[in-house]
Amino acid sequence: MKTLLLTLVVVTIVCLDLGHTLICVKQYTIFGVTPEICADGQNLCYKTWHMVYPGGYDHTRGCAATCPKMKNHDTVHCCTTDKCNL
């Protein structure tokens, strides 16, 4: 009986995923993805697109506490799951 109870406690702790830290994409290139482990209080991933010339965009990615504000001709996407800003 004690073994069953101990097993249930361990399974519960593992399933709760206590203290989950969000992981966002910091950089994405042809060579791969650079992850960023978000600090406490940063519970969003973001990706921005800034048009540098017609058809050409500069991207920024990372962690944030709040979704960045859009500027002229920018697009911003915010999300809350691991690597959702790919």
Swiss-Prot record:
Primary location recorded for the protein, binned into one broad class: secreted
Subcellular localization, as worded in the UniProt entry: Secreted
GO cellular component, one term: extracellular region
GO molecular function annotation: toxin activity
Covalent S-S links between cysteines: 24-45, 38-63, 67-78, 79-84
Entry keyword set: Disulfide bond, G-protein coupled acetylcholine receptor impairing toxin, G-protein coupled receptor impairing toxin, Neurotoxin, Postsynaptic neurotoxin, Secreted, Signal, Toxin
Tissues/organs with expression: Expressed by the venom gland.
Signal peptide: 1-21
Transmembrane residue ranges: none
InterPro entries, per the entry: Snake_3FTx (IPR003571), Snake_toxin-like_sf (IPR045860), Snake_toxin_con_site (IPR018354), Toxin_cobra-type (IPR054131)
Protein's job: Binds to the muscarinic acetylcholine receptor (CHRM).
Quaternary structure and partners: Monomer.
Family the UniProt entry places it in: Belongs to the three-finger toxin family. Short-chain subfamily. Aminergic toxin sub-subfamily.
The protein's name in its UniProt record: Short neurotoxin OH-35
Protein species of origin: Ophiophagus hannah
